[in-house]
From Swiss-Prot:
Disulfide bonds: none annotated. The lineage of its organism: Bacteria, Pseudomonadati, Pseudomonadota, Gammaproteobacteria, Pseudomonadales. HAMAP family: MdcB. The keyword Magnesium does not apply. This is Probable 2-(5''-triphosphoribosyl)-3'-dephosphocoenzyme-A synthase. Involved in the formation of 2-(5''-phosphoribosyl)-3'-dephosphocoenzyme-A, the prosthetic group of the acyl-carrier protein of the malonate decarboxylase. It comes from the Bacteria. GO terms for biological process: prosthetic group biosynthetic process. One of its GO terms (molecular function) is triphosphoribosyl-dephospho-CoA synthase activity. Belongs to the CitG/MdcB family.
């Protein structure tokens, strides 16, 4: 699908990138069956989320992603002015999201990850290979936003308590969970003949095998994190989501995480990032740089 309504005029680069970011969020939400996450079956481990809300939230972020891409074109280089413009746009996008969802945090982490990647792509649409995109996004993430004086989200608290790498550090290192695990697994599963939905599920599981998911740690502690990582490994070792043994292991993982009230929201955000990067080169083609 495409988030942008049909227009008789060719879409600009910023519009195409915003389309792709929103599509990645919707495709991630729709993917089923995801362990303990919102999907087409239901709300997973959540009581305040459902699929329609995830769709509405994703669509509300289209202007935010477009404006981030526009900012990249305006400033042209990685630096403090662009970083602080992104921070401001991200906070405005978060406010829009919260208005849309009546205060429910659906996509805060995704605004951060996809916002950086959208901006990185807009800085050089001719060089959209995963390593290049993630390197530019990482360089942006490493610049401090001087407008933010304190960091005290649930994720920040978990990082301090457990000494793990959170969403900020994942971005600053150029999204290793996406580059080194999700994208290679996506390609391996496709090459092995898996359908697209199974390949994407396997990519999510590959992220879950190693990610210190702060959403899981916040809700279920180390026990939940171990259950997520080890359970995801069992699914992939059993042949992935396309195999009967893998499906049984995936169902067991789903039930275990639900019992622990552990929802791997950080992994879901990174799957959306993976889908965005995976779709870049085929989606862009010839583009107009006009806003």
């Amino acid at each position: 699908m495409s988030a942008l309504q049909w227009s008789p005029h060719p879409a600009s680069l910023a519009e195409r990138l915003a389309d792709l970011a929103v599509d990645a969020l919707i495709d991630e939400a729709d993917l089923s069956p995801k362990p303990a996450l919102v999907d087409r079956r239901g709300s997973g481990a959540h009581t305040d989320l459902h699929l329609g809300l995830m769709h509405s939230s994703a669509l509300s972020l289209w202007p935010t992603f477009k404006w981030m891409a526009d900012a990249a074109t305006q400033f042209g280089v990685v630096g403090q002015p662009l970083r602080e413009a992104l921070g401001r746009l991200g906070r405005e996008g978060e406010a829009t999201m919260l208005r849309t969802t009546s205060g429910v945090n659906t996509h805060r982490g995704a605004i951060w990850a996809l916002g950086l990647l959208v901006t990185a792509a807009a800085l050089d649409a001719q060089e959209c290979a995963p390593e290049a995109i993630c390197a530019r996004a990482g360089a942006l993430a490493r610049i401090k936003d001087r407008q933010v004086l304190t960091q005290n989200s649930h994720g920040d608290q978990v990082v301090r308590r457990y000494g793990v790498m959170g969403a900020r550090e994942q971005a600053q290192q150029g999204f290793p969970a996406v580059r080194l695990f999700a994208l290679p697994q996506l390609q391996r599963s496709r090459a092995a003949g898996s359908g697209e939905q199974n390949a994407r599920l396997d990519a999510l599981l590959a992220i879950m095998t190693t990610l210190d998911d702060t959403c899981v740690l916040h809700r279920a502690g180390i026990e939940g994190l171990n259950a997520m990582q080890q359970g995801a490994q069992r699914v992939l070792y059993a042949g992935g989501s396309v195999s009967l043994a893998g499906r049984r292991a995936l169902n067991a993982l789903d039930q275990h995480l639900l019992a622990l009230n552990a929802s791997p929201g950080g992994a879901a955000d990174l799957l959306a990032a993976c889908l965005f990067i995976d779709g870049l080169e085929p989606a862009l083609g010839p583009v107009s740089r006009s806003a």
